[in-house]
């Protein structure tokens, strides 16, 4: 099996005789393994397993313990997160446990597949028989160990400190571990499991709570708050408050003591480079680049225009040639002749030639030629095309009167088209004249012309956006101070007028004499009351046309110009907070109230939604559960309370626990809370001293015993700690 490890493999495994036991402290956080009789474990690592794939070969490898960050580039860990063999503090994933034991025995120096040393392994208090039996089966069947013994880690820590005079033979051990907390009373040096208690709260929850609080407080830096970093911050900054309520009040009032108790964590920060104003040479260089880009764009546009003119000239030549061929064809055969060309008649072909000719003249910059019908004298136009216009009605027949009305309508329409064409021609001439003047100004001073054009564009854009806002929100007299937008403020002017007319028509119904319709103006109300009237406001106005012209012009002469989309100006012109550059203060993590708020869950688990008792109440629960009610025994127990486990390293733990227990005990009861010499390693050291005793094998059981007595026998199995 391929292992990835940074732990050095031991080389003296074969020097130990088979009678020397191997001691394992199988904690939910860390796995420790070593030899009996020694004071330090040989191998220590995180009790987790990862099985990522190697990016190059695709092989699945096993990583036990923490992964070296420098090796992350070689493995794909996205599909395989860290896995623990524990559920709370009970081993239930024995496949993961086998990976961990394989790795531990390999790092200890074991060769081959068998382990010929007795094993003492720790477990939690009141471990379920299913977990205990499967662990024994794994050690016997997979590794072939000769004998196995199970012991409680907190009990080994208590007995080890009892040997060194830290605690007495009667007392209570409180062990806030990684995922759970246990309270076990000791009477005459032996644990009384009937009086033990457990809560599902531990150091993991403290670390996770700190990680969540900091991520909510600094969402910009949430990726920095990894679980490992939160664990380091907990060990470095967290403490137990003597009085949680008063400590909270201290920070709420912002006293000087609160500032002194605040810690800081400075994240790496690199100041942004200072912006140096461009030199005159740089400005000139950029202007030359812009001019060069503008010239290239103009050349591209000119080449495109020439290509378009050539295409239209070729099209016009082919159309005129086709028209000559049509002239040589009989009138009845023209539709058949034109069937393959896409034209239905001679008139359609001539209309196409006229349109192409007009487009060609426009592309060349020449003035358009008006159709012949508009170049004629208006008098001859009236006399020839509309002969009935000047004839009196009294001498015309009914049919001629109808023709006269039709001719009058056609004449009015033709005159309207003529006026529209003349107006368009005048506008085009004015536009060409204006373009020529602007081009002359641009050639004289390009920089000044560009700045002026940009200012005009911004001004027109603001007017257009203002009109759109007025159409959306309606007019306001400035008396609305609430800042809200109700239905009346959202209606446009046309919609409000229509609502007024509808309301007036409804309330005026039946009042007085109804004379509606006697005047032609009355019928205009239907148009005003129609919803289609709202679309009139949506027609493009002169400002929008001017905006389009300025935008097109800026795109021609300024390659860096980006046209603003609709609504962008309204977003930027509102009261939007200005984005300031990030400073060193933005990368400083302030850890104030979190220092004692997170560890407080050990005493009040309800802060994170766990409805269980805290550490101080657990001690009282263990005393009440004892089978004999003796006051002297209770006093002996409270006078020797040992704190062990990783969370007992938090500053202020002993004082807070003693204060909490004193509140639930009778007045004058002796209370003494002490901390283990090494809350982290004393469990392994106690187990090592126990396994080194000559009577160790009397507390262990062999595979033969396991096979003969069965799984139920392990239910009542318990070692005698007084041998230590």
Swiss-Prot record:
**Gene Ontology BP, a term:** regulation of cytokinin-activated signaling pathway
A single GO CC term for this protein reads: nucleoplasm
Q: Where is the composition biased (Basic and acidic residues)?
A: 414-446
Per UniProt, the keywords (alphabetical) are:
Cytoplasm, DNA damage, DNA repair, Nucleus, Phosphoprotein
Ribonucleoprotein is among the record's keywords: no
Subcellular localization(s) per the UniProt record:
Nucleus; Nucleus, Nucleoplasm; Cytoplasm
What family does this chain come from, according to its entry? Belongs to the actin family. ARP5 subfamily.
> Which PANTHER family does the record cross-reference, listed alphabetically?
ACTIN
What is the documented function of this protein? Probable subunit of a chromatin-remodeling complex. Involved in DNA repair. Required for multicellular development of all organs.
Q: What is this protein called?
A: Actin-related protein 5
Organism whose genome encodes this protein: Arabidopsis thaliana
Quote the gene name from the UniProt entry. ARP5
